[in-house]
Amino acid sequence: MNAVTDLKQDYIVADIGLAGWGRKEIAIAETEMPGLMAIRDEFAAAQPLKGARIAGSLHMTIQTAVLIETLKALGADVRWASCNIFSTQDHAAAAIAASGTPVFAFKGESLKEYWDFTHRIFDWADGGTPNMILDDGGDATLLLHLGARAEKDASLIAKPTSEEETFLFAAIKEKLAKDSTWYSRNLAAIRGVTEETTTGVHRLYQMAQKGELKFPAINVNDSVTKSKFDNLYGCRESLVDGIKRATDVMIAGKIAVVAGYGDVGKGSAQALRALSAQVWVTEIDPICALQAAMEGYRVVTMDYAAEHGDIFVTCTGNYHVITHDHMAKMKDQAIVCNIGHFDNEIDIASVEKYEWDEIKPQVDHVKFPDGKKIIILAKGRLVNLGCATGHPSYVMSSSFANQTIAQIELWAERDSGKYPVGVYVLPKHLDEKVARLQLRKLNAQLTELTEQQAAYIGVKKEGPYKADHYRY
């Protein structure tokens, strides 16, 4: 990739000439994102994000372009990088760069470039720092926290345990050699973060439990209108899109093994069954396993499924769910992919020693010593974004409406004391607001409670209608 970097411009993209194409697709996406566009229209005059300088680390797609332009329309200053080396849509990045927003992203970044670009979102052109983070997976948040700790204890970045850590640690060392307090200065300036996905939320809760988190965070992922829609319905459409674009495989009749039966796994299993695959599920949680069984899926272990499955999809957010030994047992031409945030759900490092033959970008044959080949998609990273274009605009509207509301909330309350350091979720009435805005596009008609009915079930007529502990 010969990325375009103009020293007179504050961006790095694949081809700025793609901006026109990107702008046309952004215009189409806006018509499919009613919730986000309604938030833009509602708050534009008030400029609730005026003064906010947002460092964004989230997949640089067409839908994200609509989010970025919403944040700017509400008064924010924004710099952006993708949170995945394969997920950028180059025409989207070009359109945003051409509009004057600094963006550092192209499809197929190296890990070195990835961490370089993540650093760039914190380097404001005027020499200042950001004061907010919008994160997906937690890498931007991790970078500042780890870097600040490494300023005091270099041993923290002395012994990487993975390829990802090798490049992360090297990037931190390089930055510290130039500016020994860069991380702590940036960290001190951040007033809050809003986190998009399950993996990043896990990181935030772990940091909070250890006393390491240095600013308040809103867990956007666990808003109902995010997790029960983006994670489930988004994956239900984008998983198979990625597999089909990559392989053109016939799914009907195949044994498809879905590792993990959370919201992402549920959507993935539904998609594969809709195309008449025989869907097997692996699970550690007896409740999720029981749900899968009651839906008619066969619940098995990966040890058992490895030699039988034709298509494998990891959806757990966990580590080495598919191991070297599992892949060694697989059928010739088995398809292996991941739709969880990071690439370590599949032990890709363990098979790097074998012969890899690139069929096309993000589609590789891996040849084992016995001559068998398996097909690995997107090198174990997100298949729906590596091999396709991710979730549809409509479902991302819910997620990004929540992101925007969360940014407004944290920024508005930055000095009020409402959010001491910790991890929070948006209140129920805002969740319901996003759902109402989304329903407009579907011509849905909501039934209204009478005063008597509202009193009978103990809620306000206008909502919220469910207790915080309610499980949708």
From Swiss-Prot:
GO biological process, one term: S-adenosylmethionine cycle
Listed SUPFAM superfamilies: Formate/glycerate dehydrogenase catalytic domain-like, NAD(P)-binding Rossmann-fold domains
UniProt main location, coarse: cytoplasm
Its EC number(s): 3.13.2.1
Coiled coil feature spans: none
Protein residues bound to NAD(+): 197-199, 231, 260-265, 283, 318, 339-341, 384
Cofactor note text: Binds 1 NAD(+) per subunit.
Cofactors demanded by this protein: NAD(+)
Keywords, alphabetical: Cytoplasm, Hydrolase, NAD, One-carbon metabolism
Intracellular or extracellular location(s): Cytoplasm
Top EC class, one word: hydrolase
Binding site for substrate: 61, 136, 196, 226, 230
The organism's place on the tree of life at top rank: Bacteria
Pathway of action: Amino-acid biosynthesis; L-homocysteine biosynthesis; L-homocysteine from S-adenosyl-L-homocysteine: step 1/1
Catalytic function, reaction form: S-adenosyl-L-homocysteine + H2O = L-homocysteine + adenosine
GO cellular component: cytosol
Similarity field: Belongs to the adenosylhomocysteinase family.
PANTHER family recorded: ADENOSYLHOMOCYSTEINASE (PTHR23420:SF0)
Protein name: Adenosylhomocysteinase
Organism: Cupriavidus metallidurans (strain ATCC 43123 / DSM 2839 / NBRC 102507 / CH34) (Ralstonia metallidurans)
Gene: ahcY
